[in-house]
Amino acid sequence: MRSIIADSKRLVVKVGSSLVTNDGKGLDHAAIGRWAAQIAALRAQGKEVVLVSSGAIAEGMQRLGWSKRPREIDELQAAAAVGQMGLAQVYESRFTEHDIRTAQILLTHADLADRERYLNARSTLLTLLRLGVVPIINENDTVVTDEIKFGDNDTLGALVANLIEGDALIILTDQSGLFTADPRKDPNATLVAEASAGAPDLEAMAGGAGSSLGRGGMLTKILAAKRAAHSGANTVIASGRETDVLVRLAAGEAIGTQLIARTARMAARKQWMADHLQVRGHVVIDAGAVEKLTAGGKSLLPIGVIGVQGAFARGEVIACVGPDGREVARGLTNYSSAETKLIHRKPSGEIETVLGYMLEPELIHRDNLVLV
Protein backbone atom coordinates (compact mmCIF):
# COMPACT_ATOMS: atom_id res chain seq x y z
CA MET A 1 0.00 0.00 0.00
CA ARG A 2 1.34 3.40 -1.01
CA SER A 3 1.09 6.43 1.25
CA ILE A 4 -1.47 9.01 0.11
CA ILE A 5 0.99 11.72 1.14
CA ALA A 6 3.29 10.94 -1.79
CA ASP A 7 0.86 12.47 -4.27
CA SER A 8 -0.38 15.28 -2.01
CA LYS A 9 0.88 18.79 -2.65
CA ARG A 10 -0.70 20.92 0.08
CA LEU A 11 -0.33 19.45 3.56
CA VAL A 12 -1.46 20.37 7.04
CA VAL A 13 0.79 18.76 9.66
CA LYS A 14 -0.35 18.64 13.29
CA VAL A 15 2.15 17.79 16.02
CA GLY A 16 1.00 17.22 19.59
CA SER A 17 2.44 18.50 22.85
CA SER A 18 4.29 15.27 23.60
CA LEU A 19 6.24 15.57 20.34
CA VAL A 20 7.58 19.08 20.92
CA THR A 21 8.11 19.12 24.69
CA ASN A 22 10.29 17.31 27.22
CA ASP A 23 7.36 15.54 28.86
CA GLY A 24 5.89 18.91 29.72
CA LYS A 25 9.15 20.36 31.05
CA GLY A 26 9.52 23.04 28.41
CA LEU A 27 10.13 22.74 24.71
CA ASP A 28 12.32 20.04 23.20
CA HIS A 29 14.51 22.18 20.94
CA ALA A 30 16.13 19.18 19.28
CA ALA A 31 12.76 17.64 18.42
CA ILE A 32 11.52 20.92 16.96
CA GLY A 33 14.71 21.08 14.94
CA ARG A 34 13.97 17.64 13.49
CA TRP A 35 10.43 18.72 12.52
CA ALA A 36 11.84 21.80 10.82
CA ALA A 37 14.35 19.67 8.89
CA GLN A 38 11.65 17.25 7.72
CA ILE A 39 9.32 20.04 6.63
CA ALA A 40 12.22 21.66 4.80
CA ALA A 41 12.72 18.36 2.95
CA LEU A 42 9.04 18.31 1.97
CA ARG A 43 9.30 21.90 0.79
CA ALA A 44 12.26 20.93 -1.38
CA GLN A 45 9.97 18.40 -3.09
CA GLY A 46 7.55 21.17 -4.02
CA LYS A 47 5.03 20.53 -1.26
CA GLU A 48 3.29 23.31 0.65
CA VAL A 49 3.12 22.80 4.41
CA VAL A 50 1.08 24.42 7.16
CA LEU A 51 2.10 23.38 10.67
CA VAL A 52 -0.38 23.18 13.54
CA SER A 53 1.67 22.93 16.71
CA SER A 54 0.79 22.45 20.34
CA GLY A 55 3.25 23.24 23.11
CA ALA A 56 2.57 26.82 24.21
CA ILE A 57 0.98 25.95 27.54
CA ALA A 58 3.64 23.32 28.34
CA GLU A 59 6.38 25.87 27.60
CA GLY A 60 4.60 28.50 29.67
CA MET A 61 4.37 26.09 32.60
CA GLN A 62 8.13 25.55 32.41
CA ARG A 63 8.89 29.27 32.26
CA LEU A 64 6.57 29.97 35.19
CA GLY A 65 7.96 27.10 37.25
CA TRP A 66 4.70 25.10 37.37
CA SER A 67 4.99 21.31 37.56
CA LYS A 68 1.27 20.58 37.10
CA ARG A 69 -1.10 21.81 34.41
CA PRO A 70 -3.40 24.38 36.06
CA ARG A 71 -7.16 23.95 36.02
CA GLU A 72 -8.20 27.59 36.24
CA ILE A 73 -8.81 29.17 32.84
CA ASP A 74 -6.98 32.40 33.71
CA GLU A 75 -3.84 30.49 34.68
CA LEU A 76 -4.01 28.38 31.52
CA GLN A 77 -4.33 31.55 29.47
CA ALA A 78 -1.38 33.12 31.28
CA ALA A 79 0.73 30.03 30.62
CA ALA A 80 -0.25 30.13 26.94
CA ALA A 81 0.71 33.80 26.67
CA VAL A 82 4.13 33.18 28.19
CA GLY A 83 4.74 29.96 26.30
CA GLN A 84 3.67 31.17 22.87
CA MET A 85 6.63 33.55 22.82
CA GLY A 86 9.07 30.69 23.31
CA LEU A 87 7.30 28.41 20.84
CA ALA A 88 7.47 31.01 18.08
CA GLN A 89 11.10 31.81 18.84
CA VAL A 90 12.26 28.19 18.67
CA TYR A 91 10.40 27.47 15.44
CA GLU A 92 11.73 30.62 13.81
CA SER A 93 15.28 29.78 14.86
CA ARG A 94 15.10 26.19 13.62
CA PHE A 95 13.49 27.00 10.27
CA THR A 96 15.99 29.81 9.66
CA GLU A 97 18.69 27.12 9.60
CA HIS A 98 17.00 25.93 6.39
CA ASP A 99 16.51 29.46 5.02
CA ILE A 100 12.74 29.22 5.55
CA ARG A 101 10.60 32.00 6.98
CA THR A 102 7.79 31.24 9.40
CA ALA A 103 4.62 33.09 10.35
CA GLN A 104 2.67 32.80 13.59
CA ILE A 105 -1.13 32.62 13.33
CA LEU A 106 -3.36 32.28 16.41
CA LEU A 107 -7.00 31.41 15.82
CA THR A 108 -10.23 30.97 17.75
CA HIS A 109 -13.48 29.37 16.66
CA ALA A 110 -14.99 32.87 16.54
CA ASP A 111 -12.46 33.88 13.88
CA LEU A 112 -13.66 31.14 11.56
CA ALA A 113 -17.35 31.44 12.45
CA ASP A 114 -17.39 34.99 11.09
CA ARG A 115 -17.59 34.69 7.31
CA GLU A 116 -15.50 37.80 6.59
CA ARG A 117 -12.76 36.86 9.05
CA TYR A 118 -12.84 33.29 7.71
CA LEU A 119 -12.19 34.55 4.18
CA ASN A 120 -9.48 36.90 5.43
CA ALA A 121 -7.73 34.04 7.25
CA ARG A 122 -7.93 31.93 4.11
CA SER A 123 -6.50 34.72 1.96
CA THR A 124 -3.63 35.32 4.39
CA LEU A 125 -2.70 31.63 4.59
CA LEU A 126 -2.76 31.17 0.83
CA THR A 127 -0.62 34.29 0.38
CA LEU A 128 1.92 33.01 2.91
CA LEU A 129 2.14 29.69 1.07
CA ARG A 130 2.59 31.50 -2.23
CA LEU A 131 5.45 33.48 -0.67
CA GLY A 132 7.17 30.29 0.49
CA VAL A 133 6.48 30.89 4.19
CA VAL A 134 5.58 28.09 6.61
CA PRO A 135 2.58 29.22 8.69
CA ILE A 136 2.65 27.90 12.26
CA ILE A 137 -0.84 27.81 13.72
CA ASN A 138 -2.09 27.34 17.24
CA GLU A 139 -5.31 28.05 19.05
CA ASN A 140 -5.30 31.48 20.69
CA ASP A 141 -5.50 30.05 24.20
CA THR A 142 -4.84 33.45 25.76
CA VAL A 143 -8.27 34.83 24.84
CA VAL A 144 -10.28 31.70 24.13
CA THR A 145 -13.26 30.67 26.28
CA ASP A 146 -15.14 27.39 26.51
CA GLU A 147 -17.73 28.69 24.07
CA ILE A 148 -15.31 29.59 21.29
CA LYS A 149 -12.45 27.11 21.67
CA PHE A 150 -11.78 24.32 19.20
CA GLY A 151 -11.13 21.96 22.08
CA ASP A 152 -7.99 20.38 20.63
CA ASN A 153 -5.51 20.93 17.84
CA ASP A 154 -6.71 17.84 15.96
CA THR A 155 -9.96 19.69 15.28
CA LEU A 156 -8.05 22.87 14.47
CA GLY A 157 -5.88 20.95 11.99
CA ALA A 158 -8.95 19.62 10.19
CA LEU A 159 -10.54 23.07 10.01
CA VAL A 160 -7.31 24.54 8.63
CA ALA A 161 -7.17 21.76 6.02
CA ASN A 162 -10.67 22.74 4.95
CA LEU A 163 -9.85 26.44 5.08
CA ILE A 164 -6.96 26.15 2.61
CA GLU A 165 -8.39 23.19 0.66
CA GLY A 166 -5.47 21.00 1.67
CA ASP A 167 -4.85 17.67 0.00
CA ALA A 168 -4.04 15.88 3.24
CA LEU A 169 -3.97 16.24 7.01
CA ILE A 170 -1.17 14.48 8.89
CA ILE A 171 -1.87 14.02 12.60
CA LEU A 172 1.28 13.04 14.44
CA THR A 173 0.88 11.58 17.90
CA ASP A 174 2.65 9.27 20.34
CA GLN A 175 0.53 6.34 19.12
CA SER A 176 1.16 4.19 16.05
CA GLY A 177 -2.26 4.86 14.57
CA LEU A 178 -5.78 3.55 15.04
CA PHE A 179 -6.15 0.00 16.35
CA THR A 180 -9.17 -2.29 16.31
CA ALA A 181 -9.06 -2.14 20.12
CA ASP A 182 -6.85 -0.64 22.82
CA PRO A 183 -3.53 -2.50 22.27
CA ARG A 184 -2.59 -1.90 25.91
CA LYS A 185 -5.56 -3.99 27.01
CA ASP A 186 -6.21 -6.33 24.09
CA PRO A 187 -3.27 -8.41 22.77
CA ASN A 188 -5.29 -9.23 19.64
CA ALA A 189 -5.67 -5.58 18.64
CA THR A 190 -4.36 -4.85 15.14
CA LEU A 191 -3.47 -1.63 13.37
CA VAL A 192 -6.07 -0.28 10.95
CA ALA A 193 -3.91 0.45 7.91
CA GLU A 194 -6.63 2.10 5.81
CA ALA A 195 -10.31 2.97 6.12
CA SER A 196 -12.83 5.50 4.89
CA ALA A 197 -12.90 8.74 6.86
CA GLY A 198 -16.19 8.94 8.72
CA ALA A 199 -16.86 5.19 8.68
CA PRO A 200 -19.25 4.49 11.61
CA ASP A 201 -17.16 1.69 13.12
CA LEU A 202 -14.06 3.88 13.52
CA GLU A 203 -15.47 5.83 16.45
CA ALA A 204 -16.17 2.58 18.30
CA MET A 205 -12.53 1.57 17.87
CA ALA A 206 -11.14 4.89 19.12
CA GLY A 207 -10.10 5.12 22.76
CA GLY A 208 -9.51 8.16 24.96
CA ALA A 209 -5.76 8.03 25.24
CA GLY A 210 -5.24 11.72 25.99
CA SER A 211 -2.29 12.78 28.15
CA SER A 212 -2.30 15.29 31.01
CA LEU A 213 -0.42 17.80 28.86
CA GLY A 214 -2.56 17.72 25.74
CA ARG A 215 -6.31 17.47 25.19
CA GLY A 216 -6.69 15.03 22.32
CA GLY A 217 -7.32 11.30 22.39
CA MET A 218 -7.79 9.00 19.41
CA LEU A 219 -11.49 9.84 19.10
CA THR A 220 -10.71 13.49 18.38
CA LYS A 221 -8.40 12.37 15.58
CA ILE A 222 -11.09 10.17 14.01
CA LEU A 223 -13.57 13.04 14.15
CA ALA A 224 -10.95 15.42 12.74
CA ALA A 225 -10.45 13.10 9.76
CA LYS A 226 -14.21 13.07 9.20
CA ARG A 227 -14.22 16.86 9.16
CA ALA A 228 -11.20 17.12 6.88
CA ALA A 229 -13.00 14.88 4.40
CA HIS A 230 -15.60 17.62 3.90
CA SER A 231 -13.11 19.42 1.65
CA GLY A 232 -11.74 16.22 0.12
CA ALA A 233 -8.65 16.03 2.35
CA ASN A 234 -7.32 12.59 3.27
CA THR A 235 -5.88 12.01 6.75
CA VAL A 236 -2.92 10.05 8.08
CA ILE A 237 -2.64 9.31 11.80
CA ALA A 238 0.89 8.18 12.60
CA SER A 239 3.47 8.08 15.35
CA GLY A 240 5.69 11.11 15.54
CA ARG A 241 8.25 8.87 17.24
CA GLU A 242 8.98 7.18 13.91
CA THR A 243 12.29 8.38 12.50
CA ASP A 244 11.81 10.85 9.62
CA VAL A 245 8.11 10.01 9.50
CA LEU A 246 7.17 12.97 7.28
CA VAL A 247 9.93 12.28 4.77
CA ARG A 248 9.04 8.59 4.62
CA LEU A 249 5.33 9.32 4.14
CA ALA A 250 6.19 11.71 1.33
CA ALA A 251 8.33 8.98 -0.26
CA GLY A 252 5.29 6.71 -0.38
CA GLU A 253 5.89 4.54 2.67
CA ALA A 254 2.64 3.59 4.40
CA ILE A 255 2.94 4.43 8.10
CA GLY A 256 0.11 4.47 10.63
CA THR A 257 -3.53 4.72 9.60
CA GLN A 258 -4.77 6.24 6.34
CA LEU A 259 -8.32 7.59 6.39
CA ILE A 260 -9.51 8.27 2.86
CA ALA A 261 -12.02 10.98 1.96
CA ARG A 262 -14.55 9.08 -0.12
CA THR A 263 -17.60 11.31 0.34
CA ALA A 264 -18.45 14.08 -2.10
CA ARG A 265 -16.65 17.36 -1.45
CA MET A 266 -18.96 19.95 0.09
CA ALA A 267 -19.52 23.31 -1.56
CA ALA A 268 -17.38 25.96 0.14
CA ARG A 269 -20.25 27.80 1.82
CA LYS A 270 -21.87 24.61 3.12
CA GLN A 271 -18.50 23.41 4.38
CA TRP A 272 -18.13 26.64 6.34
CA MET A 273 -21.62 26.21 7.75
CA ALA A 274 -20.99 22.61 8.78
CA ASP A 275 -17.60 23.09 10.38
CA HIS A 276 -17.28 26.64 11.64
CA LEU A 277 -20.69 27.80 12.83
CA GLN A 278 -21.59 26.64 16.31
CA VAL A 279 -24.84 24.80 16.89
CA ARG A 280 -27.19 26.83 19.06
CA GLY A 281 -30.06 24.39 19.44
CA HIS A 282 -31.74 21.24 18.16
CA VAL A 283 -34.98 20.24 16.53
CA VAL A 284 -36.20 16.67 16.62
CA ILE A 285 -37.72 15.66 13.28
CA ASP A 286 -39.92 12.73 12.34
CA ALA A 287 -38.92 9.80 10.14
CA GLY A 288 -40.63 11.30 7.11
CA ALA A 289 -38.62 14.51 7.42
CA VAL A 290 -35.41 12.49 7.85
CA GLU A 291 -36.15 10.69 4.59
CA LYS A 292 -36.90 13.93 2.73
CA LEU A 293 -33.70 15.59 3.93
CA THR A 294 -31.33 12.67 3.44
CA ALA A 295 -32.71 11.08 0.29
CA GLY A 296 -34.82 13.76 -1.30
CA GLY A 297 -32.64 16.83 -0.84
CA LYS A 298 -35.63 18.79 0.43
CA SER A 299 -35.98 21.73 2.80
CA LEU A 300 -37.10 21.20 6.40
CA LEU A 301 -40.69 22.31 6.93
CA PRO A 302 -42.23 23.05 10.35
CA ILE A 303 -44.66 20.15 9.97
CA GLY A 304 -41.77 17.69 10.16
CA VAL A 305 -40.55 19.00 13.53
CA ILE A 306 -41.74 17.12 16.62
CA GLY A 307 -39.57 18.77 19.27
CA VAL A 308 -37.47 21.88 19.95
CA GLN A 309 -34.45 22.04 22.28
CA GLY A 310 -32.32 25.02 23.28
CA ALA A 311 -32.63 28.75 22.69
CA PHE A 312 -31.71 30.04 19.24
CA ALA A 313 -32.34 33.09 17.09
CA ARG A 314 -33.24 33.45 13.43
CA GLY A 315 -30.14 32.93 11.27
CA GLU A 316 -28.30 30.72 13.78
CA VAL A 317 -27.28 27.11 13.17
CA ILE A 318 -29.45 24.36 14.59
CA ALA A 319 -29.04 20.60 14.40
CA CYS A 320 -31.73 18.31 13.02
CA VAL A 321 -32.00 15.11 15.06
CA GLY A 322 -34.00 12.06 14.02
CA PRO A 323 -36.31 10.02 16.26
CA ASP A 324 -33.36 7.78 17.16
CA GLY A 325 -31.37 10.72 18.55
CA ARG A 326 -28.87 10.75 15.69
CA GLU A 327 -28.01 14.08 14.06
CA VAL A 328 -28.75 13.95 10.34
CA ALA A 329 -28.34 17.59 9.28
CA ARG A 330 -27.73 21.12 10.43
CA GLY A 331 -28.51 24.48 8.94
CA LEU A 332 -29.49 28.12 9.30
CA THR A 333 -32.94 28.49 10.81
CA ASN A 334 -35.50 30.96 9.49
CA TYR A 335 -37.27 31.10 12.84
CA SER A 336 -36.25 31.50 16.49
CA SER A 337 -36.72 28.74 19.04
CA ALA A 338 -39.75 30.55 20.49
CA GLU A 339 -41.33 30.80 17.03
CA THR A 340 -40.45 27.21 16.17
CA LYS A 341 -42.18 25.94 19.30
CA LEU A 342 -45.37 27.64 18.11
CA ILE A 343 -45.28 26.44 14.50
CA HIS A 344 -43.81 22.93 14.79
CA ARG A 345 -46.08 20.12 13.57
CA LYS A 346 -48.06 22.65 11.55
CA PRO A 347 -48.26 23.01 7.75
CA SER A 348 -46.51 26.04 6.27
CA GLY A 349 -49.88 27.48 5.27
CA GLU A 350 -50.72 27.99 8.95
CA ILE A 351 -47.53 29.87 9.93
CA GLU A 352 -49.05 33.31 9.35
CA THR A 353 -52.20 32.36 11.27
CA VAL A 354 -50.16 31.23 14.27
CA LEU A 355 -47.49 33.95 14.31
CA GLY A 356 -49.29 36.79 12.58
CA TYR A 357 -46.61 36.80 9.89
CA MET A 358 -44.61 34.37 7.74
CA LEU A 359 -40.92 34.97 7.17
CA GLU A 360 -40.38 31.86 5.05
CA PRO A 361 -42.41 28.70 4.39
CA GLU A 362 -39.41 26.53 5.44
CA LEU A 363 -37.79 26.25 8.83
CA ILE A 364 -34.47 25.56 7.05
CA HIS A 365 -34.15 26.04 3.29
CA ARG A 366 -32.22 23.30 1.51
CA ASP A 367 -29.65 25.86 0.32
CA ASN A 368 -28.83 26.54 3.97
CA LEU A 369 -28.85 22.90 5.09
CA VAL A 370 -25.96 20.43 5.31
CA LEU A 371 -26.20 16.68 5.83
CA VAL A 372 -23.84 15.32 8.49
From Swiss-Prot:
Q: What biological-process terms (Gene Ontology) are attached?
A: L-proline biosynthetic process
**Which locations, inside or outside the cell, does it occupy?**
Cytoplasm
Q: Record-annotated residues binding substrate?
A: 54, 141, 153
Work out whether the entry's keyword set contains Isomerase. Answer: no
Catalytic activity reads: L-glutamate + ATP = L-glutamyl 5-phosphate + ADP
Q: Where does ATP bind?
A: 14, 173-174
Q: Tell me which SMART domains the record gives.
A: PUA
Listed EC numbers? 2.7.2.11
Q: Which residues form the PUA domain?
A: 280-358
Q: What PROSITE patterns is this protein classified in?
A: GLUTAMATE_5_KINASE, PUA
Q: Predominant location of this chain?
A: cytoplasm
| Alphabetized InterPro entries for the sequence | AceGlu_kinase-like_sf, Asp/Glu/Uridylate_kinase, G5K_ProB, Glu/AcGlu_kinase, Glu_5kinase, Glu_5kinase/COase_Synthase, Glutamate_5-kinase_CS, PUA
List keywords of the entry alphabetically.
Answer: Amino-acid biosynthesis, ATP-binding, Cytoplasm, Kinase, Nucleotide-binding, Proline biosynthesis, Transferase
Q: In which pathway does it act?
A: Amino-acid biosynthesis; L-proline biosynthesis; L-glutamate 5-semialdehyde from L-glutamate: step 1/2
Which enzyme class, named as a word? transferase
Q: Name one GO cellular component term.
A: cytosol
Q: Which GO terms describe its molecular function?
A: ATP binding; glutamate 5-kinase activity; RNA binding
Entry similarity comment: Belongs to the glutamate 5-kinase family.
Q: Please explain the role this protein plays, according to its UniProt record.
A: Catalyzes the transfer of a phosphate group to glutamate to form L-glutamate 5-phosphate.
Against NCBIfam families, the record matches this protein to: proB
* Listed name of the protein: Glutamate 5-kinase
